[in-house]
């Protein structure tokens, strides 16, 4: 397919880091299934990235979304996203019509400053043999959701479970000052784990979930609203625990302890097939094409209905007795 990509804003001061990542991912894609084109008219699909700018959400005003509504898709990896237009979102909404207009992304388009460099540089040869994986599961993260708050309150019977509140650590700053020791510690701790716990945070998706796959470690997913990305057979490697069962997390992980080696292998296979740098551009295109083929209502019709509704509301305000 022919693919055209643009950041949602251009010029001095515009945020466009995801565009550069996309370009690199396309160049690295294996096999090279798709052609990068400069002409939106020529493209089969249009991918718009960095919708959130300093002035807020800019996706609605982008001219390509209006000109080519049925082949234009938003890419975004933030936690709190104004999800109005079809696309691939890290935190895609769960609802009656989610499958028709949205798919779930990883955090591959995150700004490089926000990624753990040790995880990004990981090679399978760095992995520890099973006998040195001495932690049943771990979680180190911010206290930013009730399910995490409950997790931090738990008292575990097993000494090989590590749960830490790291709310004082800010991974989402551009400066590297003070980040290296914590990032190295997180990486080294993860390598010792049989499972990595991935509770939801501000959004249902978790960066550490995809880090776990990259490290060949099976995730325990504690996020009822999370929509699994299409492609991987998640049941082969992930353990899903309902948020209401957080008190049973130790019991559930213990019951599956003997499966960690094979689940870890399957997790790494999923990463290599769908989320690794050589695979992710193809995954995004496949997800966008899936939306185009399966959505219930064409986007052009959705946009026309929104414009009609806005027009009727404006007219109603002008009529006698209408709202001022």
What is each PLM-predicted segment?
Residues 1-207, 215, 223-236, 256, ...:
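Nucleotide-sugar donor-binding catalytic core of glycosyltransferases
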Residues 218:
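Residue-level detector of anion-binding/catalytic polar loops
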Residues 240-261:
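C-terminal "capping" alpha-helix adjacent to the active site of nucleotide-linked donor transferases
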């Amino acid at each position: 397919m022919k693919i055209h990509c643009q950041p949602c804003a251009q010029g001095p001061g515009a945020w466009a880091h995801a565009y550069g990542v996309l370009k690199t991912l396309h160049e690295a894609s294996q096999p090279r299934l798709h052609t990068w084109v400069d002409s939106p008219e020529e493209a089969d699909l249009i991918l718009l990235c960095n919708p959130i700018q300093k002035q807020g959400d800019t996706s609605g005003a982008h001219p390509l979304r209006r000109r080519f509504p049925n082949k234009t898709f938003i890419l975004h990896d933030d936690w709190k996203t104004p999800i109005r237009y079809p696309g691939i979102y890290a935190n895609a909404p769960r609802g009656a019509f989610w499958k028709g207009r949205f798919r779930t992304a990883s955090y591959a388009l995150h700004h490089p400053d926000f990624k753990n460099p040790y995880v990004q540089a990981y090679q399978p040869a760095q992995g520890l043999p099973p006998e040195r994986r001495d932690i049943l599961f771990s979680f180190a993260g911010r206290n930013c959701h009730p399910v995490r708050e409950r997790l931090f309150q738990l008292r575990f019977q097993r000494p090989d479970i590590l749960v830490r509140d790291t709310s004082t650590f800010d991974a989402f700053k551009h400066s590297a000052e003070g980040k290296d020791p914590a990032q190295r510690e997180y990486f080294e701790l993860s390598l010792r784990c049989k499972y990595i716990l991935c509770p939801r945070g501000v959004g249902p998706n978790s960066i550490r979930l995809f880090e776990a796959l990259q490290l060949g470690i099976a995730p325990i997913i504690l996020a009822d609203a999370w929509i699994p990305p299409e492609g991987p057979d998640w049941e082969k490697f992930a353990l899903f625990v309902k948020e209401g069962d957080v008190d049973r997390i130790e019991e559930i992980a213990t019951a599956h302890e003997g499966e960690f080696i094979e689940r870890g292998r399957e997790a790494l296979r999923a990463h290599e097939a769908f989320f690794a740098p050589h695979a992710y551009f193809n995954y995004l295109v496949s997800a966008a094409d899936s939306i185009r083929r399966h959505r219930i209502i064409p986007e052009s019709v959705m946009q026309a209905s929104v414009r009609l509704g806005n027009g009727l509301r404006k007219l109603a305000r002008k009529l006698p007795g209408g709202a001022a």
